[in-house]
Amino acid sequence: MVENGGDIYLDCKRDLRVEVHAGQSSLSGKIILMIRSDRMPLGVCTSSGTVGHSFSYGRADAVCVLSVSAALADAAATRIGNLVKSAKDIERGLKTAEEILPGIRGVVIICGSHMGLAGDVELAG
């Protein structure tokens, strides 16, 4: 496992859980991704317009993208995050993610108290 500021590369022999940090969103820390060992290696990359120092055109609290390519996951999270300026834009972000499929496996978008999912995303119970 390698982590660098919201970007994670996973390659483990056991299942892992990844918590999505979404800043001040009421959903922050409540969304846990289940990453099965048979789905790795996997890049899990998060972009935010409200958390951290990186510039974003959007205001999503978290856009988390899963892909076999960590570089693609990072780029897709940034692209989708730039589109989400309010909760009303979550659907637009999901449609953009679906255009990138199957290059990415899935996406989680959190904006305020709203969330959207697309693709192969398993939430831990």
Model features per residue range: what roles?
Residues V2, L66-S113, L117, V121, ...:
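Alpha/propeptide regions of enzymes that mature by internal proteolysis
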Residues M1-D89:
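Conserved mixed alpha/beta catalytic, RNA-binding, or beta-rich assembly cores of soluble enzyme
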